[in-house]
Amino acid sequence: MNKNLKNVFFVLIIMMVVLIIAYNYENNAGATKDISYSDFLNMLEPVEGKKPLGKLYKGNVDKYNKIQIEKDVIEGFYIPSEYLESKTAKPVKFRTTVAPLDKDLIASLRKANVSFDARSAEEGKFWSVIGSNILLIVILIGLFWFIMMRQIQSTGNKAFSFGKSKAKMTMDPKVKITFEDVAGCEEAKEELVEIIEFLKDPKKFHAIGARIPTGVLLVGPPGTGKTLLARAVAGEAGVPFFSISGSDFVEMFVGVGASRVRDLFDQGKKNSPCIIFIDEIDAVGRLRGAGLGGGHDEREQTLNQMLVEMDGFEKNEGVIVMAATNRADVLDPALLRPGRFDRQVMVDLPDIKGREEILKVHSRKVPMTSDISLHSIARGTPGFTGADLANLINEGALLAARKNKKRVTQEELEEARDKVMMGPERKSFFISEKEKEVIAYHEAGHAILGTLLPYTEPVHKVTIIPRGRALGLTQSLPKEDKHILPKTYWLDQIIVAMGGFIAEEFKFGVTSTGSSNDIQQASNIARKMVCEWGMSEKLGTVNYSGDQTNVFIGRDMGHSSKYYSEEFAAMIDKEVREIIQTCLNKGRDLVRKNASKFEGLAKALLAKETISHEELMTIVHPANEEGAKKKPEKTVKSKKQNGIKANPAYNE
């Protein structure tokens, strides 16, 4: 039944109810008055000296002018005495009981020329009472049921079917997503293409004795494209695709989750071959027996049912389960074993090539100028996910539209990247001249050390315009993605982090609260060098941090987070202080030796507020000096760097 027919049906029911109510009201207009039999006879044959109640109605309307006789009951209409002279008087309905011995009633009626009619007590009552009142009740119940069902369907639920699966089946979506719309995760695509080939041509795999994986688990950080990959599989497979969220299984009603799992797999078997996709499966697949509330709850029942459905006594031939999560560490081991989720596909952060491909995909529908360099944007966005890059392109388009441009230029993309990475500019934020000077020298300290040290990333931009929660920023962008970072790199990172502290100390003789985050960052690096990365000779290659994964309440509570004695705790603190102090001394020496460049950069920041990489290199490396950052020598003359031994292998 389409929407228009439903509306017509709804209107007809309302009209019927209104008509029945009006009919009953008309029939029962005015209350029936019970009178004595003597009063009735007095109106029929008035007695001298006794005033009658009125006059029996004998008008032209058949509805009123007949006396109805049903066994010992008489009903009719009369006009009260006080309204006899009125032409608009409305008859009053009366009822009386006939005396059982009155045999002259009929003769009296005939003598008075009163029309009358006799009927049995049952006649007409079924249709008048049952036909109107009960029919009205039935219609009202039907109307209530219709409204209730319509309301339930409009909210997407099913009445009395809490245990039914909420999975949505996709066969041929209008907006079809394919693997051409997915970039930056080629290995993951290859794994999934194999599953699609099996669904399209299973004989090819059966002939060689291969068994397709029962389940595929997509694992990766948020925003890397796990759900997008699943949508691409739905577009490519050409088979029914059921999608559901892990949170849709668990409700407030006990047993609903397990029932929905059964119903979901029943639907899958009926539509085999098919794919079932469960997004955020960690909502239902968490480790059993772990938690403050005990080992048995609704989630465990749901998980147990899912384990049975995926690999129990009954085989689900042709039903492939896909799932996505960014918390694979909290999933139950029984869910991850071969036979259930045979294959785990890692969807990690894209590298520079992957980021460039993702930018190309998202920029297809965005008009851009011909001089756009997506490679430079990709190089300047390390650690960005696919969702971040899509947001960057959208922000660039919004900025271009705000400037009334027809095409997006490199300027908008650069500005959008800075906005996504560092937050929007707060040009209206008031800063006094004294504070602005402190900020300028603080950022100049970061920038000058980041440019002079050999193992740091190139400084891309320095600004004293507040962005987000920061009052000033020094942005460094790597030339390439790095996966193995040596000790020398981290030592230089500590020096750069403390650059603002060193600059304030050198220029003003005192430091400010603006260095608090820098100190925290440097301390974290130094502590990891000592406790996790084995970069301390005194403490050796021992892990003092324990398991650094996210705590799972119930499994990890009560476990000690301290893996060393008080003696070693003091040694760790001492080693961390020594590393930071050594880096501070080297940073102070560099700033002191390059004081003129440091002053020039700070004054340029006060004048321009933002300094680009090219302007920075002009200040730090004038034309008469070497125009590039000094590179480390290929041979190691000394095995120590500022009193801390460095690994010679990384200096080559």
From Swiss-Prot:
It is found in: Cell inner membrane. Its EC number is 3.4.24.-. Zn(2+) binds at H442, H446, D518. SMART domains: AAA (SM00382). Pfam families: AAA, AAA_lid_3, FtsH_ext, Peptidase_M41. It comes from the Bacteria. This is ATP-dependent zinc metalloprotease FtsH. The lineage of its organism: Bacteria, Pseudomonadati, Spirochaetota, Spirochaetia, Leptospirales.
